[in-house]
Amino acid sequence: MQACCFARSEGGSTKRRRAQVGTRVFVLVLATAMASGHACAQSLIDTLSQAYSYNPQLDAERARLRATDEDVARANSGYRPNVFGSADISRERTNISPNTGTNGSNTPKGYAVQLVQPVFRGFRTTNAVNAAEASVRAGREQLRLVEQDVLLSAVQAYGDVVRDQAIVRLRENNLKFLSTELQATRDRFAVGEVTRTDVAQAEARRSLAVSDLELAKANIKTSRGVYEQIVGNPPQRLVEAKPDTRLVPGSLDEAIGIGTQENPQIVGALYSEQASRFQVDQIRGELLPEAQLEATYSDRYDGSSQIDRVESASILGRLNVPIYPDGGEVYARVRQAKHTHVSLIQQIEQARSVVKADVIRNWSQLQAFKAQSVADRAQIDANQTALNGVREEEKVGQRTLLEVLNAQQELLLSQVQLETTKRNVLVASYAVVASIGRLSVSEVGAASNVYVPEAHLDEVRNKWWGLDITHDDGRSEHMDAWGARIEREPVK
């Protein structure tokens, strides 16, 4: 029986509310794992799932998108009535000299309610809603882009830890080999088979191995720290990951074709340009007539007159026709919006160029690293054969100890290079997937609870009132700005 337990850091009140239950589960799972006596193996898919669920950069971008969703609700408010209420009360005292019998005091008071219903606003509301919808779609593409960056960073961090773990093992084995070789050389020196020079050479190589091992241990500490920063918890026993070949296109042309259609940079730029077009029409609508209905009800009490109470109700239609509004400021804003639109059109072309270059670069690097991997494996085989031969020849006096040490060093360097190349192949393959716009938890199968941004928009699109906000976990909360604070539990 084997159990896995990953300590995860959570922030916010919802995650604190899960603490008691989570603690019980953690203790139970930890006890099972300790009883089993086996370390928990953690795969790349596990890492991507954790990064997707707990990375604060992703949480921040989701909150930013939910804020953008509210632009749709704001735009829809242009279809709805405005209701105003007012009330007043005062105290008056009148003294007239000579006294005419009207001296005295009274308390006039009253209230009124007014409803204003827009009928026609020059298509401004329609264009505002369309612009907000397009901006939300652009925001979703930005969220996709951040998700890709986070997942690719998680792949890089995972590959770095696996690489550095392997290098530490290689350095440890090398130190053991050189320690054994040094002891054997000292024994041979004691019986006069080798010289003091041979002993010094063996000692120097062992000292170098100690230094290299300490550097490798420092590197893995750094890699583990970066991993924890991105994923949210320290790495467990990571296993070597293979590139997911089903996600990588079969050719460069296919990759470019997919990238120009699906990369979030391009798709987001297209939606931003669409939003800009609607914004031009929205501002232009300020030059068109505006019609609205106004309904008013009032009730007043005035004890100073013969009429004690006045109750009135009215309804009217109002048409406003702009002739030269705001001294030409509206015309300037229309021209300004058009220039912004032209700029966004150029940004689409820029995004296409950048994406194409990224696809070509990442694809070329992937092919180069694959070829290098084949060469590294061949080099290791050759160096291993050479080391075996040199050691046998050194036993019969045909080779020196220095040649044995050099052969061992060449084998070690080729093994270290292979670990670096395997990491580069893994990262480059996912970089290709990211550059074509298909690096997501849905594609790699790394999360069962995928964030659905459409749910929040559907909730607030036609929301008439309410101050509570909804978080990415579906929890509704009333949060005041002056009472807000950042809380995050320490990583276990």
Predicted regions, residues:
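N-terminal secretory signal peptides that target proteins for export/translocation
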Residues: M1-V21
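Short flexible linkers and secondary-structure junctions
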Residues: C40-D160, D164, V168, L178-S179, ...
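Bacterial Sec-pathway N-terminal export signals of envelope proteins
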Residues: A39-S86, V119, P235-E273, I323, ...
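Sec/SRP-type N-terminal targeting helices
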Residues: D59-A63, N76-R80, F84, S105, ...
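Acidic, low-complexity, intrinsically disordered peripheral segments
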Residues: R8, K15, E419-K492
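Periplasmic alpha-helical coiled-coil/stalk elements that build and connect Gram-negative outer-membrane
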Residues: K15-R16, D149-Q261, S272, N362-Q365, ...
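Outer-membrane beta-barrel translocator domains and adjoining extracellular loop/strand segments
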Residues: N95-T102, N127, E240-K242, L288, ...
